[in-house]
Amino acid sequence: MDVHRDFLIACIAATNAQGVTEYQSRRFSTYTGSLRELRDWLLANDCKDVCMESTGKYWFPVHNILEESCHVVVSHPKFVKAIKGKKTDKKDAQWIADLFKHDLVRGSFIPPKDIRQLRDLCRYWVKLSSYMTGEKNRAQNCLTVSNFKLDDVFSNVFGKSASAITTQLLEHPGEQFDVAPFVDGRCKTPIAQIQEAVDGIFTYEQAEKLKIIRGHMDSLERHKAELESLILEIAQNYLPQIELLLTVPGIHDAFTAIRILAEIGADMTVFDTSKHLCSWAGLTPQNAESAGKKKTTRIGKSGAYLKPLLIQVALAASRGEKHPEIYGKKQALQKRRGKKKAIVAIARRLLTAIYHI
């Protein structure tokens, strides 16, 4: 199938006993009713093996309709790209059918529906966290522009004491006040230094901007908490797998385990070996060799969500003396290959352990 935003072209390739292949092509819209017609048309022609390329998000509705009745293979466009020449949507669909018929298409990993839903929510949580980081940076910029040096006297500008002082500054602009009642007793910075740090000037525009930013941050925090509750509720069906993941060094909380589970799924048989899983996650060097020379040995770009998470887990596992075997391996690799490559190697070892667990 050649899938587009508003329509798709489906081509059935049927080979008879004499080895002659006959093609049937039809065009369907991407409305749900038309996709059901596509499903019925495929079943009426006894076609239960379907292949399509992953074009953006447009393949999702098609896959959702067909996955219960057909074996659906979704492939990266580079694996089904037609040779240069005359190009039409109908010819593209026929080309994909021919490749699939001869078992020349490498399918992408599509996890079960419940894992896909969990993955979607976890990735949205990552996006909200990114938005929160951006808003914190903008809030800090407002304070810096107005010459409030809270970041010099507090370790966390968004902690309890600093937030209370910021609220006082916004509610009473231009007024002098004593900061002592707003500072927590555990704060080690002298009150006099804090008092000097809050001697800035808020313009009307910067103050209003900061109010909007703080309101947005509160909204993001609330929605993140709601999303976390939903994710934890859905993940209850995978408690045994989550408990196993928590035994891996560096994974200290259930939410991290859930995020890893949402990316790789619970069934490791879809990957032939642990090396296939590591390659899929983008933790192995690329193969780019020509005329006996390696052009690059950089790791791949895949695993945009899983790879950063595993790097964080590797950093946590290789820090301190809790796991001396991992710490020692990281130190040995770091001397020879550098810190970044050492951490990637540790992340790959941890993912290999996850595969076998």
Predicted regions and their residues:
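A detector of single, family-specific signature residues
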Residues: 1-357
